[in-house]
Amino acid sequence: MKILIPMVGCLLLIGVFHSRGTAQAPATVWDGVFTADQAKRGEALYKQECAACHGDALEGNAQTERGQRLERVLPPLSGDVFMGNWNGRLLSDLFDKIRRTMPRDEQGKLSLKQNADILAYMLKFNEFPAGKAELPSDPSQLTETRFESVKPK
């Protein structure tokens, strides 16, 4: 009995460490989290609802002058600034930002599905790969996916 208890304890510890070692890495936007068809729908919605302010090439809107420099009225949705702003954050944060604040003068106008489609287009535009499953329109299903600007190794 004295030997059995330590052996059981050791086996339990081995099981705990083994399960930690085989845990999957968190999903990222590099894992194909949207479909090409979804991004195509999102592109049409983007052009209709977003391009007037954020630009056809998702470059943002830099039309106000303050002193000698132009300041962006609305931020870019592509490129280094966009990637840097969202790097390391949860995809649910970006989805929620879009859902709560856009379109600028009609927040909440778009359905969750439309917001997911637009986000899929933004990801495609930023050269993240499409996959086989659509990006979920339920924000709680996006809390396990990280926005990583550089593809993990």
Feature roles, as predicted:
Residues 107-153:
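Flexible coil segments in periplasmic/lumen-exposed cytochrome c-class electron-transfer proteins
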Residues 1-33, 140-153:
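N-terminal export/targeting leaders of redox proteins
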Residues 42, 46-57, 118, 122:
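The canonical Cys-X-X-Cys-His
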Residues 54, 78, 102, 123-126:
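Protein kinase-like catalytic domain
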Residues 33, 58-96:
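Gly/Gly-Pro-rich "capping" loops immediately C-terminal to redox-active cysteine motifs
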Residues 40-48, 88, 112:
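Sequence context surrounding c-type heme c attachment/ligation sites in exported
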Residues 21-45, 61, 106:
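Electrostatic cytochrome c docking/interface patches
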Residues 79, 83, 100-108:
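General structural signal for alpha-helix termini and helix-helix connectors
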